[in-house]
Amino acid sequence: MDMVSLAWAALMVVFTFSLSLVVWGRSGL
């Protein structure tokens, strides 16, 4: 796994995590 793939994977994980956090926060969970 090269650095570009690793960077993209990390970016997707952070984006998905923050997005789900916002959704859960608005749901009141």
Curated annotation (Swiss-Prot):
What GO cellular-component annotations does this UniProt entry give? chloroplast thylakoid membrane; cytochrome b6f complex
Q: Which UniProt keywords apply?
A: Chloroplast, Electron transport, Membrane, Photosynthesis, Plastid, Thylakoid, Transmembrane, Transmembrane helix, Transport
Q: Decide whether keyword NADP is in the record.
A: no
Q: Which domain of life is it from?
A: Eukaryota
How does this protein lie in the membrane?
Single-pass membrane protein
Q: Name one GO molecular function term.
A: electron transporter, transferring electrons within cytochrome b6/f complex of photosystem II activity
Subcellular location, in the record's words? Plastid, Chloroplast thylakoid membrane
One GO biological process from the UniProt record?
cytochrome complex assembly
Stretches that traverse the bilayer: 3-23
Tell me which InterPro entries the record gives.
Cytochr_b6-f_cplx_su8_sf (IPR036143), Cytochrome_b6-f_cplx_su8 (IPR005497)
Sequence similarity: Belongs to the PetN family.
| Job of this protein | Component of the cytochrome b6-f complex, which mediates electron transfer between photosystem II (PSII) and photosystem I (PSI), cyclic electron flow around PSI, and state transitions.
Q: How does it assemble?
A: The 4 large subunits of the cytochrome b6-f complex are cytochrome b6, subunit IV (17 kDa polypeptide, PetD), cytochrome f and the Rieske protein, while the 4 small subunits are PetG, PetL, PetM and PetN. The complex functions as a dimer.
Name of the featured protein: Cytochrome b6-f complex subunit 8
Q: Which organism is it from?
A: Cucumis sativus
